[in-house]
Amino acid sequence: LDRLRLPAGHAMRDVVRLENPLSEAQSTMRPTLLGSLLDAARHNVSRNGPDVAIFESGAVYRAGDARATHSLVDEHQALGALLTGALGGWASKSWRGEPGESDFFAAKALLGALLDKFHVDWSVQPATAWPFLHPGRAAEVLAGDGYGGSVSEPVLAETGMLAEGERPPASVGFVGEVHPLVAGQWDLERTAVFAIDLGKLAAAAAPVVAFKPFASVPSLRRDLAVTLPDPIAAAQVLERVREAGGEVLDDVSVFDVYTGPQVGEGMRSLALALSFRAPDRTLTEEDVEPARARIVAALGELGGELRV
């Protein structure tokens, strides 16, 4: 736990101690999968296997108030994954067209593919609760109904962000790059991980999954380049675009990012690919223009300006 840079009082230091351990090194029940993932990665890297993509599913434990109340410890099933080195053939190239790196975006993409299989609404938000993750390259994973942010349920209901019958999103885990100081403890280079609580994830999954038929008509793609302040996260931009686009917006993605003198200090340019589609007909420019105008207006509310 010291190698994970966990300060005194951190929740992950609330470990379950064994009364008769086989050795001092195995005297506690693990509070996280991260240690065993890092051990496995170092084992492979030290044996000429620099490119690692591994996962583990198993129980993790927290003591809680079990000793004081003579109750059972907090045990839950967790799933974790780790990437280091070059990504294999399973991963697509980056938006720059280069081979993928084991970075935050690769781990988030892998996590997203998994969560989509659960048919769960999910989002991420910047987080600093895990000292073993790289500051600025770490996020909390939220899953479930409602607004994707750390806002209390009463506030959500009062502001209308939480519709009737919806639940506030649950924090189910983290995703990010391992802090360089922590990775160095295991003799690893750039490394990305995620870990989620499978029990919380199952509770957040949609109880009913609706079938969406395959589209029989082509989509209409339009690209936008928008300049935004650096603090505005791409995930926030995509969320606002989806809301503004309405039913005719089939998909949106970021395919380029630019920072430099042309956009000014503290700003960056995001290039967005917008895909419009209707289920029963081929859309025209006149059909998509209202949705595009709403998207431009929504980006303006975030402080964005279109680049020509």
Regions found by a protein language model. Give the residues of each.
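Mobile "lid/hinge" segments at catalytic clefts and subdomain interfaces of large enzymes
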Residues: 44, 48, 62-64, 68
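Predominant activation on well-ordered alpha-helical scaffold segments within soluble catalytic domains
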Residues: 34-38, 42, 58, 76, ...
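Conserved catalytic motifs of ABC-family nucleotide-binding domains
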Residues: 81
